[in-house]
Amino acid sequence: MRNIQIALTKGRLEKHVIPLFEQIGIDCSELKNKGRKLVFQSKNTDISFILVKAVDVATYVEHGVADIGVVGKDILMENEKDIYEMLDLGVGVCKFCVASIPTYNPKSYRKKCIATKYPHITSNYFHNKGEDVEIIKIEGSVEIAPILGLADAIVDIVETGKTLQENGLIVFEEMYSISARMIVNKAALKTKKDEIFSIVNMMEQEILSGK
């Protein structure tokens, strides 16, 4: 088996995904005791892992540094990359939502101002609804934007809704459901077809058996 390099995102999604790899027989002991390391070798397979920021996973896969990547669908929707999306892993499930303070009127004909970390997704969503909105990109916590009057509402990923609730915001619209996806480099799918499909097929069977 030729070496397969897999890019994972650090943090919450990583914790959801590692058990899936372990369940298909890939040793992840180094990943679970990583310290400050960012590159790891599976002890029982020719598979190595790299840990990068979520927004960079698809970039590493697109450019062939990684053969396979696991990343949230939000990243793929916001940043169009020339890769194959192979599998919905069914973990890290969240929703894109429009949220604001209780006095927000989503049916108002007045041009709205929306704060978000995801301007591309937000623009497409409102365009498809036939609404012209002003979009302000914010890198940090967007919840404060409608509270301070910077924006009428926000578009953000909601998992439990606790953060919104703690800041006095409510969900007005549920836009899209998202989850972790397995992506593959296009060239690698030709040169390492058997190895990649072996991982994808085993992962798919594991997901189906767990439903």
From Swiss-Prot:
Pfam families linked to this entry: HisG
The entry's keywords: Amino-acid biosynthesis, ATP-binding, Cytoplasm, Glycosyltransferase, Histidine biosynthesis, Nucleotide-binding, Transferase
Residues forming coiled coils: none
Any one Gene Ontology cellular component term annotated for this protein: cytoplasm
Cell compartment(s), UniProt: Cytoplasm
Pathway, per record: Amino-acid biosynthesis; L-histidine biosynthesis; L-histidine from 5-phospho-alpha-D-ribose 1-diphosphate: step 1/9
Keyword RNA-binding (UniProt): no
Keyword ATP-binding: yes
Gene3D superfamilies, alphabetized: Periplasmic binding protein-like II
Main location: cytoplasm
InterPro entries cross-referenced by the UniProt entry: ATP_PRibTrfase_cat (IPR013820), ATP_PRibTrfase_CS (IPR018198), ATP_PRibTrfase_HisG (IPR001348), ATP_PRibTrfase_HisG_short (IPR024893)
Reactions that this protein is recorded to catalyse: 1-(5-phospho-beta-D-ribosyl)-ATP + diphosphate = 5-phospho-alpha-D-ribose 1-diphosphate + ATP
NCBIfam families referenced in this protein's UniProt entry, alphabetically: hisG
Subunit field text: Heteromultimer composed of HisG and HisZ subunits.
Job of this protein: Catalyzes the condensation of ATP and 5-phosphoribose 1-diphosphate to form N'-(5'-phosphoribosyl)-ATP (PR-ATP). Has a crucial role in the pathway because the rate of histidine biosynthesis seems to be controlled primarily by regulation of HisG enzymatic activity.
UniProt similarity note: Belongs to the ATP phosphoribosyltransferase family. Short subfamily.
Protein name, as recorded: ATP phosphoribosyltransferase
Originating organism: Bacillus cereus (strain AH820)
Name of the gene encoding the protein in the UniProt record: hisG
